[in-house]
């Protein structure tokens, strides 16, 4: 998570859906949790059960795992969230499906992706430091149509 639009999106989600009466024992799963230049966990600090996964070990990563393997965790979550990862993953559709599968009934699946107008980043051509651990060397801006 790196820019103000992403931060504001997560803050708005939290402000709109999470209030003082919300159960603080909710279980959160974040896909792509490595702290490259900011972390969602700080914005969702109300949760006492938070699991962050990413492709490599590093700050804010609890488990090293591909997002397409999250069903192997054998549990369901109240919030399943991924910010700015799908545009770097060839298998983003599988990851999204798995996110929906591991979400509890009446839960939240929250996704933020790079879209139209965002310049390529996180590849060998553009500087892969923005997508550490990604071996796909893949980039695609996504739109609403991609999810339909």
Residue ranges of model-derived segments:
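Redox-cofactor binding/interface segments in oxidoreductases and associated redox assembly factors
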Residues: 30, 82, 111
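Alpha-helical architecture
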Residues: 64, 85-86
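A short glycine-/small-residue-rich loop at the edge of a beta-strand within enzyme catalytic domains
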Residues: 50, 87, 104
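A short beta-strand submotif of the Rossmann-like class I SAM-dependent methyltransferase core
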Residues: 79-85
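Active-site micro-motifs of SAM-dependent methyltransferase domains
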Residues: 69, 87, 118
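S-adenosyl-L-methionine-dependent methyltransferase catalytic module, highlighting the catalytic core
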Residues: 90-148
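Conserved N-terminal segment of class I S-adenosyl-L-methionine
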Residues: 1-75, 79, 135-144
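Flexible loop residues that form catalytic
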Residues: 36, 85, 114
């Amino acid at each position: 998570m790196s820019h103000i639009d992403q931060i504001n999106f997560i803050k708005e989600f939290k402000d709109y859906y999470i209030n003082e009466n919300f159960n603080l024992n909710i279980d959160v799963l974040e896909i792509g949790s490595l702290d490259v230049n900011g972390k969602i966990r700080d914005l969702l600090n109300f949760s006492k059960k938070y699991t962050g996964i990413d492709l490599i070990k590093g700050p804010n990563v609890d488990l090293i795992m591909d997002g397409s393997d999250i069903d192997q965790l054998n549990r369901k979550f109240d919030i399943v969230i991924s910010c700015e990862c799908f545009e770097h993953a060839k298998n983003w559709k599988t990851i999204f499906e798995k996110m929906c599968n591991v979400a509890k009934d009446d839960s939240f699946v929250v996704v933020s992706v790079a879209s139209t107008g965002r310049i390529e980043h996180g590849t060998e051509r553009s500087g892969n430091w923005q997508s550490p651990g990604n071996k796909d060397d893949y980039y695609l801006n996504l739109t609403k149509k991609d999810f339909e």
